[in-house]
């Protein structure tokens, strides 16, 4: 029987780890292990992001004693866990407008401050109860129209079917990350040891917790 993962009510430092420590050895995992062990005076919370649980075997590293909290989330299992009935829905107009504003800001090359202000608004609304919910992304008319517009304006090579499913696969996990950000225990510092989805999770935490 495997040992239960440690859980805590709070920690000093949260490390956001994507496809690395403690399930993968070498490289980034080695220095993560070294960092944690170098600071025994700090309590660490580890958030591991992986593809699917079946892609990982046992831990390759024993968790140091100062890891007081460990949680793991699998990005592509959200497709299997999402049991939403497809149904016609217009979509939330405020949520659609926020996404369009953020996309337009990136296209215009707005200043970092302007784009981050819009990202802050989007991040807040992706949390449970916000106006940007997974159901609308998957099934709403507004989301469909946005994908169609982007494809017409910017995609000349891949088929629309490829574009549509790639968009779903890439973006659907963001709502899982919103739930992770909402539920993470209080910490004093967050460090993203990986970019990609872990970096996005770090951005969500920065913009939803301050």
Question: Where are the regions a protein language model picked out?
Answer:
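Extreme N-terminal starter segment of soluble prokaryotic enzymes
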Residues: 9-13
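Short amphipathic alpha-helix
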Residues: 28-39
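Short amphipathic alpha-helices and their capping/turn segments at secondary-structure boundaries
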Residues: 2-4, 203-208
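A short, glycine/small-residue-rich beta-strand->loop->alpha-helix junction that serves as a flexible
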Residues: 19-30
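Short N-terminal targeting/anchoring amphipathic segment
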Residues: 182-197, 208
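Short, well-ordered alpha-helical microsegments
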Residues: 32, 197-201
């Amino acid at each position: 029987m495997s040992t239960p993962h440690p859980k805590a009510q709070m920690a000093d430092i949260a490390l956001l780890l994507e496809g690395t420590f403690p399930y993968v050895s070498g490289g980034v995992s080695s220095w993560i292990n070294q960092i944690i062990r170098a600071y025994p005076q700090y309590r660490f919370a580890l958030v591991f992001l992986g593809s699917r649980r079946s892609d990982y075997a046992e831990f390759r590293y024993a968790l140091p004693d100062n890891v007081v909290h460990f949680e793991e989330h699998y990005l592509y299992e959200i497709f299997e866990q999402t049991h939403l009935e497809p149904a016609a829905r217009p979509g939330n107009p405020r949520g659609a407008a926020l996404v369009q504003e953020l996309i337009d800001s990136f296209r215009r090359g707005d200043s970092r401050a302007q784009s981050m202000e819009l990202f802050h608004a989007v991040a807040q609304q992706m949390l449970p109860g916000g106006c940007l919910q997974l159901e609308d992304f998957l099934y709403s008319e507004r989301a469909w129209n946005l994908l169609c517009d982007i494809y017409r304006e910017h995609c000349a090579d891949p088929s629309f079917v490829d574009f549509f499913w790639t968009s779903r696969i890439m973006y659907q996990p963001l709502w899982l990350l919103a739930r992770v950000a909402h539920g993470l225990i209080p910490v004093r510092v967050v460090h993203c040891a990986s970019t990609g989805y872990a970096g996005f999770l770090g951005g969500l935490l920065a913009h939803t917790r301050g």
